[in-house]
Amino acid sequence: MLAKQRFVLDTTAFTDNQLRELLGDGDLNLSVDRMLDLIARSRIKLNISCHMPPITYKEFTDYMTRYDCPEETLIKAETWIVKKTPNRYDTQIPSQIFYEYVHDIRERMNKGLRISETLLWEAGIQSIIMASRDVKKTEIESEVLGKAIKDLRKKYRSALRKGTLDSAPDLDVLLLAKELGAGVVAADDGIRVWAERLGLRFLNATSFPKMLKEYLKYYE
């Protein structure tokens, strides 16, 4: 019997756009179905198990349901993906990790504040200039404030969320991987960054199926 390998999968391990092209020629449902076939064969032949926290699994299945995923594919997911809630109380995380995370979030909040202040000043000045030229209030709201709000949403979201943990499913993926001594599979920069800080093995969503195929090629 081969030594058991475990992997904890994020939703992006199935839904990544590059993975769709790699496995399904751009078709999400076909890509997910083929990925699950690889997972099933690897479980039977290579003793490789793939896990998801329940909250992440629900996120994944809800996403697939919105894209009219066939029932057969959802049954495969239910069969071959092991659902387990991480032990949030006994899993040990170094205090330095918490320090780094709080520092990271604080820096992002400060950056988000600076972005907000800059955009507000720019919108305010532009509104005053347009008002002095007797531009209608509705036109100012449409051209200046509408654009400012759109830019603020985009830049603020990027400042606060890109490259860090921004959801409970993300955190559960890392906690479960830490508990099981498992690798992490995702296409999320935040998960990658914090998996590496925790000393966890990390595989990109497009690398994982390639690895499974390579293993299976030599077994079969």
UniProtKB/Swiss-Prot annotation:
Keyword Hydrolase carried by entry: yes
Keywords: Endonuclease, Hydrolase, Nuclease, tRNA processing
Catalysis performed (reactions): Endonucleolytic cleavage of RNA, removing 5'-extranucleotides from tRNA precursor
Top-rank lineage group of the source organism: Archaea
One Pfam family cited in the UniProt record for this chain: PIN_5
GO function terms (MF aspect): ribonuclease P activity
GO biological process: tRNA 5'-leader removal
EC code(s) of this entry: 3.1.26.5
NCBIfam families per UniProt: PRK04358.1-4 (NF003343), RNA_lig_partner (TIGR03875)
Protein family per UniProt: Belongs to the HARP family.
Function: RNA-free RNase P that catalyzes the removal of the 5'-leader sequence from pre-tRNA to produce the mature 5'-terminus.
This protein's name: RNA-free ribonuclease P
Native source organism of the sequence: Methanothermobacter thermautotrophicus (strain ATCC 29096 / DSM 1053 / JCM 10044 / NBRC 100330 / Delta H)
